Amino acid sequence: MSTRAEVCAVACAELFRDAGEIMISPMTNMASVGARLARLTFAPDILLTDGEAQLLADTPALGKTGAPNRIEGWMPFGRVFETLAWGRRHVVMGANQVDRYGNQNISAFGPLQRPTRQMFGVRGSPGNTINHATSYWVGNHCKRVFVEAVDVVSGIGYDKVDPDNPAFRFVNVYRVVSNLGVFDFGGPDHSMRAVSLHPGVTPGDVRDATSFEVHDLDAAEQTRLPTDDELHLIRAVIDPKSLRDREIRS
């Protein structure tokens, strides 16, 4: 029997189905489990780094860097920016706040000029969201995170896109995976829409945990369960220390 964390790991893996040969940058343990699972199953061409400056030829467990003689390529910081601008990258970040149009906040809570709590700053969010596919992992789906409007825009959402400005043509806020379900921005005016709800989650659960309307909740499918082979990979190969369980509130 699979846990909620393992269902979420599979949902994160599905972010990369049919991605082809692109660089994947998972910024959380859950997203890293998903990326490794995808690479070991249906997306063998995706590229992963060791978190420093090398592309991995193998797919080590979380916290491991693989054999030193199994390096696939060189990816120093400068080349990351080249890849980012080229668009052949999909990043999965966290979000302290996300709104109905996919704006993300990891910078600060409160008014921009007088924030009540400082966080990371915008970091790479602006460059990520304007150049290539960006998804978000949220381990605690609640109204404090899924807000009507973010306090500070770190990563841009669809309501910030100027259709007459070619600089915005690559914006692709792809999906949000939370502990309750999977969501995209296929609703009216690129607003949030339910793609699937995890087993045991009801539309009412999502409504109660979200500060805005999520479209198509009642029509959402059930998130698929991991196969036996996927469960083995998650538990024994990718994440034997069960780090995935620390990121989720079931």
Swiss-Prot record:
Catalytic activity: (3E)-2-(2-carboxylatoethyl)-3-methyl-6-oxocyclohex-1-ene-1-carboxyl-CoA + H2O = 6-methyl-3,7-dioxodecanedioyl-CoA
Record-linked InterPro entries: CoA_trans_fam_I (IPR004165), NagB/RpiA_transferase-like (IPR037171)
Knockout consequences: IpdAB double deletion mutant does not grow on cholesterol, but grows as the wild-type on glycerol. In the presence of cholesterol, ipdAB double deletion mutant accumulates COCHEA-CoA. Double mutant does not survive in macrophages and displays severely depleted CoASH levels that correlate with a cholesterol-dependent toxicity.
Enzyme class: lyase
Pathway(s) it belongs to: Steroid metabolism; cholesterol degradation
EC code: 4.1.99.-
Keywords for the protein's UniProt record, in alphabetical order: Cholesterol metabolism, Lipid metabolism, Lyase, Steroid metabolism, Sterol metabolism
Molecular-function GO term, any one: CoA-transferase activity
Gene Ontology BP terms: biological process involved in interaction with host; cholesterol catabolic process
Superkingdom in the source lineage: Bacteria
Function: Involved in the final steps of cholesterol and steroid degradation. Opens the last steroid ring of cholesterol by catalyzing the hydrolysis of (3E)-2-(2-carboxylatoethyl)-3-methyl-6-oxocyclohex-1-ene-1-carboxyl-CoA (COCHEA-CoA) to 6-methyl-3,7-dioxodecanedioyl-CoA (MeDODA-CoA).
Assembly information from the UniProt record: Heterotetramer composed of 2 IpdA subunits and 2 IpdB subunits.
Family stated for the protein in its record: Belongs to the 3-oxoacid CoA-transferase subunit B family.
Name of the featured protein: Cholesterol ring-cleaving hydrolase IpdB subunit
Phylogenetic lineage: Bacteria, Bacillati, Actinomycetota, Actinomycetes, Mycobacteriales
Gene: ipdB
